[in-house]
Curated annotation (Swiss-Prot):
It catalyses: L-lysyl-[protein] + 3 S-adenosyl-L-methionine = N(6),N(6),N(6)-trimethyl-L-lysyl-[protein] + 3 S-adenosyl-L-homocysteine + 3 H(+). Methylates ribosomal protein L11. Pfam families: PrmA. Its EC number is 2.1.1.-. It comes from Pseudomonas putida (strain ATCC 47054 / DSM 6125 / CFBP 8728 / NCIMB 11950 / KT2440). This is Ribosomal protein L11 methyltransferase. Keywords: Cytoplasm, Methyltransferase, S-adenosyl-L-methionine, Transferase. Its main location: cytoplasm. SUPFAM superfamilies: S-adenosyl-L-methionine-dependent methyltransferases (SSF53335).
Length: 292
């Protein structure tokens, strides 16, 4: 069915006021969008940042009167409205549209990430079937791609691999399909642990092959291979801990790092690892090396 969409151009300071007011006058959803292609990376802890110029989009039932909505907003906020407009939009099958756009992707020589509803393009390749969970890795982001390609290029047979910040489990599962003996995944998000477990089962990974932990429950260990696709800040602050999780002679790959942050992150690991040249893609980098 169609919907009435109301759009307001607001500042971050106005966001909460107008969100509350729109919900009070009957909006069924309220969404904030960047108005000027302004990226936000690594926000401070316990903050929900907005762009300096933000579009607020609210959906109403199609029979809602936009002039009445605007009149109620003026009444509730006690102020003239910022730049605003209303239009009727047709409903779409958003899930189907998204599924159609998520296609199989190849990483390196052997590895494919294949949506579970899609046929594998190469039956004899290493095919990882994925139903991505909310906000977790699918391989479409450059940092995930950098890590997957790195894993594809390693000799993983017989190794133990640690996926630190496992998200969907895509890196741990890829390592197992590429020959790792066992993998360990850890994440601070319980939903990530569940998504990883579901994706492992979808790929026929036995429970004893993949151990999943919240950080506080992870046992002491030194892995043969550690991959961490998180953020530069945690990678720097956790450098002593992550370095200690890799055995002497073991391998490390880090991503989730902006290009301008690469040297700082590399410096945090240089004492403990013989580092490879930094690999850059689309403004993101991968740092890898071997434990001294």
């Amino acid at each position: 069915m169609p919907w009435l969409q109301v759009r307001l151009a607001i500042s971050p300071e106005q966001a909460e006021t107008y969100e509350d007011a729109l919900l009070e006058v009957g909006a069924v959803s309220v969404t904030f969008m960047d108005a000027e292609d302004q990226p936000i990376f690594e926000p401070d802890l316990n903050t929900t940042p907005l762009w300096s110029h933000t579009h607020l989009l609210a959906l109403f039932e199609a029979n809602a009167d936009p002039e009445q909505v605007f009149a109620h907003l003026r009444l509730l906020t006690g102020a003239e409205l910022p730049e605003h407009q209303a239009e009727v939009i047709e409903d779409q099958d958003w899930e189907r549209s998204w599924m159609d756009n998520f296609q199989p992707m190849r990483f390196g020589r052997r590895l494919w990430i294949v949506p579970s509803w899609h046929d594998a393009p190469e039956k004899d390749a290493v095919n990882l079937l994925l139903d991505p969970g909310l906000a977790f890795g699918t391989g479409t982001h450059p940092t995930t791609a950098l890590c997957l390609e790195w894993l594809d290029g390693q000799q993983l047979e017989g190794t133990q691999v640690l996926d630190f910040g496992c998200g969907s489990g895509i890196l741990a599962i890829a390592a197992l399909l590429l020959g790792a003996r066992e993998a360990v995944g850890t994440d601070i998000d319980v939903q990530a642990i569940e998504a990883s477990r579901d994706n492992a089962q979808r790929n026929g990974i036995a429970d004893e092959k993949l151990a999943l932990y919240l950080p506080e429950h992870m046992p002491a260990m030194q892995a043969d291979v550690l991959v961490a696709n998180i953020l530069a800040g945690p990678l720097v602050s956790l450098a002593p801990q992550l370095s200690g999780l890799v055995r002497p002679g073991g391998l490390l790959a880090l991503s989730g790092i902006l290009a301008e942050q690469g040297e700082d992150v590399a410096a945090a690991y240089a004492a403990d690892f013989e580092l490879d040249p930094i690999v850059v893609r689309d403004g993101w980098v991968r740092i890898s090396g071997r434990r001294r």
